[in-house]
Structures are given as structure tokens and as C-alpha cells.
Amino acid sequence: MKLQLDTSLVKECRQAAGKIADEVQRFIGPRSTQSVERTVLRLMGVNDAIDGVPLANIIVDNLAARGELGLGAAYWLGNACKQLGLSPQEAAAKVAANELDLLAIPREEPGVLRPFLQELAQPGLRKIVDNRRQREQMQQKLKMGPAPLLYVIVATGDIMRDVPQAQAAAEQGADIVAVIRTTGQSLLDYVPHGATREGFGGTYATQENFRIMRKALDETGEKLGRYIMLVNYCSGLCMPEIAALGALERLDMMLNDALYGILFRDINMERTLIDQNFSRVINAYAGIIINSGEDNYLTTSDAVAEAHTVTASQFINEQLALAAGLSPWQMGLGHAFEIDPDLED
């Protein structure tokens, strides 16, 4: 079925949305957030935790408390790596153990240090590029199921119980498996570490949980001769960090929208729009498809009376996604409306 839409009106809507997106991008451009800074550290290889507290949080919190985050966490950690001959992970561990003060060692000028920082970032970026290439090769070899693709949700709270559910879903025809996050994870200002076996209404999004589920679905996909896509949720206070961890573990799709957190979680809109932009930059680079969250906006509203708000959001989301480098094929726009089927147009 093809909708006979007024193309001139669609063009006008896109132009209006583009103006809004341009204004947002001008605000985002010169700014960062603590989550963005933690993400950069994670991409440099700082992904361990001590007593459940991620090293990235320890470093960023330490710098922020001392008013020294303005130059960026990567600058301070990278400077220590260069001066002391340490890897980012080694330097971060020393900071966490109170064996190293990042502010107490000689400093390189930021411009002089930049090439070295780029070197430190290369292993993480290469890993993401390799994952993207591997996904493309596997999809070419195994193919995807016939359209429309079947999307199934699993979430027991225990990643070890999620795995057999996800594999069973794939064996019954699911092409895409989404693992819902535990209730309230969007309001945690850190990403839990390791495999988790207790969640509430969902399973924690962690790098290890991503790795476990990716491995399981790859094994099932090989057996079935179909590539099974893995989905998680990239929103809330750690939006860009989860994007980075998903990219490092070859997730295929992310729910990636700031507006739900603004409307329903009371998250600071300036912070979360900055976070959203960086998370979408990562998803664009990783070849990950994003889904926006317009269907969630309508859970407390009448779908017909407020349909125009969804359309407006979709146009704006499209323009913000393009500004972050996402290609049209990577954009999935939420549009699940709960409408009485007997309602006349």
C-alpha cells in the first residue's frame, strides 16, 4: 500500500524540523556531559569496575568534583598514560586505588597531546569497525528472515535465563530479539558491570550481558541459517555509554530516544539531548539501527487526538538523526498507535 501524501507538505515539514534540529545542534556542538566523558574513556578501553563502581565513573567524578573536567577526561587520563607509560586501563586502576593523582603530574598542551589521544582511541574504534564488517558478512552469509521481520521481547531479569528464551524465540521464527532493561535503569548514572542475574521487569544492560546474548544468538543463527538481530535500550542517563558498549559487542539495533526520558523520567533535557547526539554518532559509526520512542509517548494520551505530536516528533527525530551521521536505513521511527479499529477516518 502506498500513501498518497502531499510531497510539498512533507518537504515543508522536513524544512521546519531541520530548523529546530539546527538550533539544537548549535547548542550541542560545544558541550559535553559526564556521561559523554565516561563514554570516551570506555572507548579508550577503561571498562573495568572496582567493588561494582565503574572506573570511568571514578575518574570523571573525581575530575568533576575538583572542577577540572572542562578539558575532558580523555585529556587528563591520556596525559598520565603518556607521562608514565601506562595503558588507559592501568592508569585508571591506579587512580581508583588512590595511587595516582591525574592533576599532580606534568602536563602536555592539549594540542600537542591530541595525536597521542587519537592513538589511544584506535583499538576501540577498530573493534567497532571489525564488528560492523563481521555483521555485514554474517548477514550476507546467513541472510535475514523474510519481511516483515518478527520482533520478540525477552526479559526475565536473569541473563542466564534470558538466553534459552531468546534461542527458543529464534527457533520459533523470531528475527529480532530485544532484551528489556530492568525497571529504572534509565535513572542509574552508571552502567552495572558483569553478568547479572537479578532484575525487575527486565535485565540489566551491561557489556557482559550483551556479550553473552550476542554469542548465544550467533550460535542459534548458525544452526538455523538465519542472522538473528539483538536489540537493547540506549536511553536515560547513560545513553552514550550503552551505545558504546553495544557497538563493542555487536548489537544490531538500539532504542535510542531522549524525549521519553524528558517527558516521563524528568531527565534534564539539555544533558540528555547532548547524550543522544553522541550516542547516535556512535550508532552511526557502528552500523546500528536506531528506533525512536514515539509509541511510548502515547501511553498516557489518546492516540488519535495527539497523533500530530507523534508526527512532529518523527520529523524532528529524523533531522537530529541525520545531523548525528545516521543514514536513512539506520532510522526506525516508533509509530505503534493504540487505535480502535472501528474508528472511521
Model-derived segments and their meaning:
Residues 1-160, 168-173, 184, 191-208, ...:
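Long, compositionally biased, glycine/small-hydrophobic-enriched stretches that function as flexible linkers
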Residues 166-169, 246, 281-282, 320-321:
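Generic structural signal for hydrophobic
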Residues 221-222, 247, 253:
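C-terminal basic regulatory modules in eukaryotic proteins
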Residues 270-281, 297-345:
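Active-site capping/gating regions of soluble enzymes
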